[in-house]
Amino acid sequence: MTFTKACSVDEVPPGEALQVSHDAQKVAIFNVDGEFFATQDQCTHGEWSLSEGGYLDGDVVECSLHMGKFCVRTGKVKSPPPCEPLKVYPIRIEGRDVLVDFSRAALHA
C-alpha cells in the first residue's frame, strides 16, 4: 500500500468533512468523533459533493441534493435514492497527518 498525506487532522474538526484532490480523484475525508474515513466525494446518485454539500450525522453522510445517505465507514447506501455504494479508501493517521492510499479504492456492496 502507498499512503500519501491528504491533510492534517486539524483541518477536519469532529463531525466535519474536507475535500482533497489527488490526481483526478476528489476524495472526502470525514472525522467521526476523532476517527477518520475516506470515500469518493461525489454522490453516486448525482454530481454532488458530499464534503461540501452533505451533512454528517455520526458515521452517516446525507447528500443534500436528494437526501440519499451513505455509511462513511463502509460506503454502503443507508437510504435511497442512491443504489450504488461509495468507493472507500484505506486511511491511517501518523502523528497529525491523515494518510490515504488513493490507489486502493474499494466497493463494499
Curated annotation (Swiss-Prot):
* Protein keywords: 2Fe-2S, Aromatic hydrocarbons catabolism, Electron transport, Iron, Iron-sulfur, Metal-binding, Transport
Q: Where in this chain does the record put each Rieske domain?
A: 4-100
Gene3D superfamilies to which the protein is assigned, alphabetical = Rieske [2Fe-2S] iron-sulphur domain (2.102.10.10)
GO MF term (any one): 2 iron, 2 sulfur cluster binding
What are the binding positions for [2Fe-2S] cluster in this chain? 43, 45, 63, 66
Q: Name one GO biological process term.
A: catabolic process
A Pfam family that this protein carries is Rieske
SUPFAM superfamilies to which the protein is assigned, alphabetical: ISP domain
Provide the family line.
Belongs to the bacterial ring-hydroxylating dioxygenase ferredoxin component family.
How would you summarize the oligomeric state and partners of this protein?
Answer: This dioxygenase system consists of four proteins: the two subunits of the hydroxylase component (BphA1 and BphA2), a ferredoxin (BphA3) and a ferredoxin reductase (BphA4).
Q: Which PANTHER family match?
A: 3-PHENYLPROPIONATE_CINNAMIC ACID DIOXYGENASE FERREDOXIN SUBUNIT (PTHR21496:SF23), FERREDOXIN-RELATED (PTHR21496)
Name of protein: Biphenyl dioxygenase ferredoxin subunit
